Amino acid sequence: GFLEYAENIGDYLPVRTEKLFFHQFAGAEVIKTRLYDDFHNADADRHIVYLKAANAFVVVDTVHPRAAQEMTTGVMYHAEHISPVEPGVYRVQEETAEGLMHFHRYKSASRAHAQQSLCIAFAGEGVSYSMEAQRRNYRQETALSCYTSRYYGADEYYSYVSLLIPETGETKQEIEAQRARALGIVHSLRTAHTRMGRSLTVQLKADGLEYTIGIQCDDGACIEDKNLRPTYSYEVGRASYGAFETDAKFLVSDGRTYGMIDGSRVDHRGKTLFSAYPNRCNQLDFVTVLQRAGTWGSYEDVL
């Protein structure tokens, strides 16, 4: 399994991490972090998107090797008890009082509600799953992994998509209803990516809303090299995410509203919803003038 492979690497390797942005929209929140692994000559980005109305989390982990190489990569979740539901779908049971006793200053309290849980689903094809026992945090836990071993081309991006849905309630009947709802959302989950994985689309349906998440995995996708000086271009950076087309680094929509981060234009079904004010850019020869547009840090509106 993936845990055994990771343990065979040896000691923890030094890495650097960085928070790139955190933004709150009316219907969603998103945070992006990056891990720099100089030992493996690769980087990894993580987007955590919280869909407020759906009360669900979409976690996207993108691996980007800096050179062509073979790698085994994956994502791993830890919990006291994890059980399989169907291929690629798992249920994390609520922590028990005995399992939490090792935490500092924890005091056992009587339960006033039924046993709650968390649904974890993985999207994508060609991946493997493993569940392995692990001694962690002074107790016995289960490590749930979604991983793959493959050859990465130069400038290739590979994304793992996880969907996390809390299954909560005060009674057993309420929790069972939430579990049925969670499976309905899981079965609507769809992903798509462009060549070399440079952009990723995640779509799902929840409570009558159709969500679209678009991620530009390649930070340099919008840079156009005109030999004299690199310039920003919407035409070079644009990508399609379902019914949307934009050059934004991130886009999220629930079918009624939309929000984007670091983009100059957003189109929906061929109609321009947002466009930054155009400007002109001189080349270093002071003769050639390029028509360009600056990006906005963020923007949101109704469709």
Language-model features: locations:
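Catalytic and substrate-binding regions of extracellular carbohydrate-active enzymes
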Residues: G1-E98, A154-Y158, T168
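Short conserved micro-motifs at the rims of enzyme active sites and ligand-binding pockets
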Residues: L13, A44, M131-A133, T171-I175
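Short, well-ordered strand-loop elements centered on a beta-strand within folded domains, enriched
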Residues: F57-V60, T73-V75, S117-C119, S130, ...
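Short, flexible beta-strand-to-coil junctions
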Residues: H64-R66, E95-T96, Y106-A109, H113, ...
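Trp/Gly-enriched beta-strand surface patches
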Residues: E86-C146, I223
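A surface-exposed beta-strand-loop module
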Residues: R139-S159
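Non-catalytic terminal regions with compositionally biased, polar/charged low complexity
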Residues: E156, I165-L303
